[in-house]
Amino acid sequence: MATAVGMNIQLLLEAADYLERREREAEHGYASMLPYSKDRDAFKRRNKPKKNSTSSRSTHNEMEKNRRAHLRLCLEKLKGLVPLGPESSRHTTLSLLTKAKLHIKKLEDCDRKAVHQIDQLQREQRHLKRRLEKLGAERTRMDSVGSVVSSERSDSDREELDVDVDVDVDVDVEGTDYLNGDLGWSSSVSDSDERGSMQSLGSDEGYSSATVKRAKLQDGHKAGLGL
């Protein structure tokens, strides 16, 4: 009787201690597990159902078989990803994993080199872009200077062309006067030549008609004489 009362008092003390801890933990914002109790542990062991050892063993065997099948599938996939060489069928699991580890390191090195090369190319691209912008600004400035020079040159060429046209007009006028004089002299000479030709032609025609008349008179005289 005294023993039972003592156990009940001990349980009450543990419960009170637990409640105080929970209140303190609630104030500080964290919680803890229940204090260990032999009676509660014994109660759980008594109420724990007994499992069948045969069914547990079969379940374990089935899980192990599935795990091995999954492992074989993963190893086959790994063989397709890792370069193994001509004797790939003779490789053990350990050698396959070793080669896979080396291949992963090689890929990581290639990845680091690629990242470094990309950074270098990006820096070069930025440098070329700045240089292109600078050249574009210089080209715009040169185009503006060239347009100013071209406009000035066109103005000077236009002035020189006006001067040349004035000189050519003066020369052409003088040449026309000289040509008119030549044409007048040649026309007078041609007129005199034409008049001389007409006179000579008329004299020739008169001479010819007189000769014909004289021949006809001689023929008539001979006929009258009976010759």
Swiss-Prot record:
Keyword Magnesium among UniProt keywords: no
UniProt main location, coarse: nucleus
Gene Ontology biological-process annotations: negative regulation of transcription by RNA polymerase II
Compositionally biased residues, Basic and acidic residues: 216-227
Maturation and modification: Ubiquitinated by BIRC2/c-IAP1, leading to its subsequent degradation by the proteasome.
GO cellular component terms, semicolon-separated: Mad-Max complex
Domain of life (superkingdom): Eukaryota
Region annotation (Disordered) ranges: 30-66, 142-161, 184-227
Keywords: DNA-binding, Nucleus, Repressor, Transcription, Transcription regulation, Ubl conjugation
Record field: compositional bias (Polar residues): 198-211
InterPro entries according to UniProt: bHLH_dom, HLH_DNA-bd_sf, MXD1_bHLHzip
Subunit description: Heterodimer with MAX; the interaction is required for DNA-binding. DNA binding requires dimerization with another bHLH protein; does not form homodimers, and does not bind to DNA in the absence of MAX in vitro. Interacts with RNF17.
Described function: Component of a transcriptional repressor complex together with MAX. In complex with MAX binds to the core DNA sequence 5'-CAC[GA]TG-3'. Antagonizes MYC transcriptional activity by competing with MYC for MAX binding. Binds to the TERT promoter and represses telomerase expression, possibly by interfering with MYC binding.
Name of the protein in its database record: Max dimerization protein 1
Gene (UniProt): Mxd1
